[in-house]
Amino acid sequence: MSNPDIGRSCMLVNAAEMLKKAEAGHYALGAFNTNNLEWTLAVLQAAEEAKSPLILQCTAGAAKWMGGFKVCADMVKAAVEATGVTVPVALHLDHGSYEDCFKCIEAGFTSIMYDGSHEETFQINLDRTKELVELAHSKGISIEAEVGGIGGVEDGVASNGELADPAECKQIADLGVDFLACGIGNIHGVYPADWAGLSFERLSEIKAEVGDLPLVLHGGTGIPEDQIKKDQRQHRPAARLRQGRSRLHRGRQGPPGQGLRPPQAPQGRPRQHRRSRQGAHGGVRFRQQGLIAWLQTCFKA
C-alpha cells in the first residue's frame, strides 16, 4: 500500500527544525523575499523542483504593499496548498521591528526576525529579544535576532554596517534564539567596488562564542560565490543564506546565464489583458529557472 503522505502538500512550519537538519547535514538554507503572488509561486515551485527546504520571507514594507501581514500569510498558505509543494516551507518576517513581530505572530507567520540592531542601546535589543523569544516559542514559532547592523539599506532602513561584537552575540544567543544574524562585512543591496569582503576572522570569533547556533548571512545576492561557499564550508554550515529581493529582481545575480528578469510579454495578441497574463506566467517560469540554478549551485537539501 502506498504511503498516503507521499506527494501531500506540506503545511507551513517554523524554521528551527529545518535549520537543525541543515546543521547536521552541513548545508545552507536559502531564504527568499517575496513581494507578490507571482514571485511567491516562482520560489515555491523552484524549491519543490530542487527538493530544497525553503524559508519564504517578507518585510513590513512588502507586506504593506500586499495589504498587510494577514493578507501575505493567507496568500502564501493558499499558494503552498495550490502548488502542492512537499518540501518544508517556513514563512518568515524579515527585519521586523518590535511591533511587527507581534503583528506577524497574530497573522500566522511561522517564524519572525526581530532586528534590534537599530535600537538606541544594546540593552533594549537584549530585553526585547528575551520577551519575543518567550512569546514566539510559546506559539511554536522560530525567532531570529540580529547583532551588529548589516550595511546598506533594507526596507528603507539604512545602516553603515559593522562587525558584530562576539560577546554581544553570545548574550543574545544565550536567550534561546533559533538563529542569529551578525554583521561580518556583508551589505544589503549593491556592493561597492572597494568592498573588503567578508571577515572570516570575526565569523570564527563569533562561532567560538555561540557554538552550534545557526548563523544567518544577509545580503547574499552581492557576495561572490566563492566566499559564499567558503562561508558555508568553514564556518557556517547551517547558515540561512539570504537572497535579497532588490538584486534578484534586477536579474543581475545567480549563476552565469541564469538572471531573474522575466521575459517580455508575448507580442501580437489582440487583447492587452491576455498579454499581461501570458507575460506574468512567463515571468514566473523564468524566475523559477534562475532560482533553481541558485538552489542547485549554492545549497544542498
For the regions a protein language model found, what residue spans apply to each?
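N-terminal amphipathic/basic-hydrophobic helices that include classical n-h-c signal peptides
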Residues: 1-10, 291, 295-301
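N-terminal amphipathic alpha-helix/helix-capping segment at the start of soluble metabolic enzymes
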Residues: 3-30, 77
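Alpha/beta enzyme core
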Residues: 13-21, 36-62, 67-86, 95-213, ...
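Conserved phosphate/anionic-ligand binding catalytic regions in large, soluble enzymes, centered on
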Residues: 32, 36, 242
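Glycine-rich beta-strand-to-loop/alpha-helix junction loops that act as flexible
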Residues: 217-221
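C-terminal alpha-helical cap/extension of soluble enzyme domains
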Residues: 225-299
